[in-house]
């Protein structure tokens, strides 16, 4: 009985074992054939554990001015590292850690703009290594090399990529800035960098490969690579020389106490923005930003009497204007409100033409009564007020022209009770400069892909026909009387620049306070000037607006200086002092150096001879250029070697011309005129040399020379 029971148990055990092994065999067969266990693909799981994938970061595109001068680009960036652990040093003759903390701190302090005490505090850390920030973060290659030349034991660097703006605080709000995120990608945060972030960023690629247990690529395997597509390059309509003039005038305004300001210059014929600066500004390399909004497109304000250009023009277009008609100036009562001229006593009975020259609020108010709110608003809308212009800059505002009652309409006729932006003023003024055509402002000249192919071209865009040539010509004559003193009521003769035939209109606007009433006091106004020149056929439109300036002559001072700088640069002088044909540049290629030098001196031009060769092989400017007296002509000779020359006090334009002719790159800082450079005079030029040039505004140079 027991024996039989034992046999049954054994057979049962054997059966269980057989079933178990059958199950295992079936399971293994299933796994080997399907690669799936518990709904998990084992093949994919194993592959993922052995496969590494690296992101290939696309290089961000650069931003240039219209001529190809670089305004924003990627550069190698370095962070200063101090190794503190003594065990890093295995050979005392070649220490690999910081040995002399005192010497290291005192040497680095002026170089990375940190106090010696702060650096000493960091060097006394018990850590293996420390990062010397903030001053030692994001330094340039030039500064890295200067630190390396000090041979400080234990000082090293980590490398990264950062966005660099070679001109520092220059066109800052337009360019904006971009910063590196935690994934080492660079993203735009303001300005063009933000608006065109997708186009500048490009498309990242990747590298996928099989790795061993230590994370290294297995040599016998072939990686899968999808190359990154670098970002597009953006060329702005900005003329760097005109931008420099604008920046210099903004520097002057900033030395006076004010709230904010904007100066913008536009090509009257095309709508290209040639220069624009706002204050308070910032350096996009250091991001010392007090406001993230650009006044040019984002600030709305009541503009004041510059709007009389458009309310008077509206009356002309509606056949309601007779410039010789008399009216009583001084004040007018509308409903229960009294509107006064700035000259509260008025000028007596004067014509409407005289009222425009004197910036009479009463004249504008009476014209608004003839027009009515609908016709005035309709004309303002034709010019683009109340709508975004669509310029390709972020955070553009549309302003407000929702006047309703008769007194509000009167206020709107002289620029109160409605709000605009500077870019809207530029667009509206284009109507007067272009025989009634409203031209859309634009700031991007072209966009190229990573291969240099042009994929977008900016162009002139006529939005509508808002006025007739007859009426805009009339308005230009009125704007001339504002500044030339030819009419008894004119008061803005301190704006007059007769050699460039400037015309324009002043503006003084009250500022609304937080309580709803207007601010009081001598300086609580927005002062502005809309100008264009030459008056009979404008090439340039500009707008200067300053909030709460304490220097009441600042706007006319800046206006005259800006017009003279731009007019001379663009050769728009309307007087007899214009360049004559003997200032025209010829082709000097293959001519004898001495003969060319004498020829240019006789033309009262300034030859800059590069090298000691007896023949000219390259020149700039090229044949046909018309120059002003004492302008430089750069001549590259047939020399076996070239030596550095003195460029102190040169303008950025001249420096750029020289280095372009030499086919060399350089780093620059600041703007204005050259005050120092990194090379030694008469050293032989090596195209691989790293050159740095420092500029300062003229007023700073003059101030330093008198100290």
Sequence positions of predicted segments:
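Short, well-structured beta-strand/strand-turn elements
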Residues: 75, 154-158, 256, 324-325, ...
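Periplasmic/cell-envelope proteins involved in peptidoglycan metabolism and beta-lactam response
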Residues: 1-285, 374-382, 545, 552-568, ...
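Ligand-recognition elements built from short beta-strands and adjacent flexible loops
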Residues: 499, 544-549, 554-556, 560-707
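Acidic/histidine-enriched alpha-helical segments
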Residues: 118-127, 259-270, 329, 393-397, ...
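Beta-lactam-recognizing serine transpeptidase/beta-lactamase-like catalytic domain environment
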Residues: 72, 212-223, 261-304, 310-544
